[in-house]
């Protein structure tokens, strides 16, 4: 038996979606509604055979969801909306409460909205997406899949910041970690490709895109991750600084009179590859500039790799060794240069790349005699979301859901 599951990612002015046939994971359609709220919004819908794109005014998310559901039947992808068996929603922040994906009920929704103080840019619109689909598809079960849930297995030594205790106890300031759905998916896919239980492996997963995070996975569980209280921390990213000396911030307040909002803008949108190179936040553009002799661009690439290498090294020490290193995300999946820079001079760990395999982004790119496996795995958060819907919302389908 097959089930049609929707995976939804609602952004502040966008709605990203996939419709999958489960448990096979076959993609029936995917698309994006962007520039919601503007007179020239754009709706893109793709199947394996066709692509439709339309520019039109879309006033709000309610109109966007209505348009999407009408298109599914209007374009013949579904004969009826009753064919939809479940909807999974990506939610940025689950706090300490959600240690797994959760079946949506009124209480779940209220908690997602309460956690908006920890993710003010994401949780409110994630909750809005859930409410709209519940309103328009009232008979269809919904599941919330949290970016933070996979990291709820961290020990206190990994998640607690050395601040006065009350900042954790009263304000919830601690490491939460993000990209959890991606790290969970690629580590599970790695174990499947190796034919080894994930519980038997020590893995470091590098999700490298415009946002970047590194995750240590031991015994099938996240034991450390580079992003912390917010997705701004950790390694260097496209426009985000990652970790830096916290005293820089009050110093900038005194020196330049910057407000909290200006500091947030600086750290989140003006730093990282863009800030150091002065060229772009896109790794490919910085590569091109470095190849043309731009010294700051070359420095940005080196700094990017070194921050990741330092994080990987600390995780290897924490886990007592390494069995596999995973690269995923836009940079991790596509940049042989980034992978080579990160894996440089690691022969002493039993980790070495095969240059030819790395250049063609083979699934496994380690040298033949290397002890540590190095894998390039395309992430698929939507498939992971659909699996969680199968597992939690469709009891009759649990045995069909691929274990994750």
UniProtKB/Swiss-Prot annotation:
Pathway: Polyol metabolism; 1,2-propanediol degradation. It comes from the Bacteria. Disulfide bonds: none annotated. Keywords: ATP-binding, Cytoplasm, Kinase, Nucleotide-binding, Transferase. It is found in: Cytoplasm. GO terms for biological process: acetate metabolic process; propanediol catabolic process; propionate catabolic process. Belongs to the acetokinase family. PduW subfamily. Works with phosphate acetyltransferase (pta) to capture exogenous propionate and regenerate propionyl-CoA during degradation of 1,2-propanediol (1,2-PD). PANTHER family: ACETATE KINASE, ACETATE KINASE-RELATED. This is Propionate kinase. It comes from Klebsiella pneumoniae subsp. pneumoniae (strain ATCC 700721 / MGH 78578). The lineage of its organism: Bacteria, Pseudomonadati, Pseudomonadota, Gammaproteobacteria, Enterobacterales. The gene is pduW.
């Amino acid at each position: 038996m097959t089930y049609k599951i929707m995976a939804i990612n609602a952004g502040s002015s966008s709605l990203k979606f996939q419709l999958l046939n489960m448990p096979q994971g076959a993609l029936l359609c995917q698309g994006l509604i962007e520039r919601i709220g503007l007179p020239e919004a754009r709706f893109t819908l793709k199947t394996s055979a066709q692509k439709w794109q339309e520019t039109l005014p879309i006033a709000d998310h309610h109109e966007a969801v209505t348009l999407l559901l009408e298109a599914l039947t209007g374009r013949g992808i579904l004969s009826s909306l009753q064919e939809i068996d479940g909807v999974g929603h990506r939610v940025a922040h689950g706090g300490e409460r959600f240690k797994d994906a959760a079946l949506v009920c009124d209480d779940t929704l209220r908690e997602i909205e309460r956690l908006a103080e920890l993710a003010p840019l994401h949780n409110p619109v994630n909750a809005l997406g859930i409410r709209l689909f519940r309103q328009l598809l009232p008979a269809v079960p919904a599941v919330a899949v949290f970016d933070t849930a996979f990291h709820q297995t961290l020990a206190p030594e990994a998640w607690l910041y050395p601040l006065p205790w009350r900042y954790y106890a009263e304000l919830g300031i601690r490491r939460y970690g993000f990209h959890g759905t991606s790290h969970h998916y690629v580590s599970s896919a790695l174990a499947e490709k190796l034919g080894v239980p994930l519980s038997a492996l020590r893995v470091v997963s590098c999700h490298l895109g415009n946002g970047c995070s590194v995750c240590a996975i031991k015994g099938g569980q996240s034991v450390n991750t580079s992003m912390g209280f917010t997705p701004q921390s950790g390694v260097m990213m496209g426009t985000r600084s990652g970790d830096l000396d916290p005293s820089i911030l009050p110093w900038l307040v005194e020196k330049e009179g910057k407000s909290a909002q200006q500091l947030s803008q600086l750290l989140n949108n003006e730093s990282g590859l863009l800030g150091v190179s002065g060229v772009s936040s896109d790794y490919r553009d910085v590569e091109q500039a470095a190849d043309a002799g731009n010294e700051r661009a070359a420095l940005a690439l080196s700094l990017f790799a070194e921050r990741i290498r330092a994080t990987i090294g600390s995780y290897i020490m924490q886990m007592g060794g390494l069995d596999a290193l995973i690269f995923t995300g836009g940079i991790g999946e596509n940049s042989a240069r980034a992978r080579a820079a990160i894996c440089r001079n690691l022969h002493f760990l039993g980790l070495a790349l095969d240059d030819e395999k790395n250049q063609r982004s083979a699934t496994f790119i380690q040298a033949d005699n290397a002890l540590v496996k190095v894998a390039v795995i395309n992430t698929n958060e939507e498939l992971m979301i659909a699996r969680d819907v199968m597992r939690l919302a469709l009891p009759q389908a649990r045995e069909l859901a691929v274990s994750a």
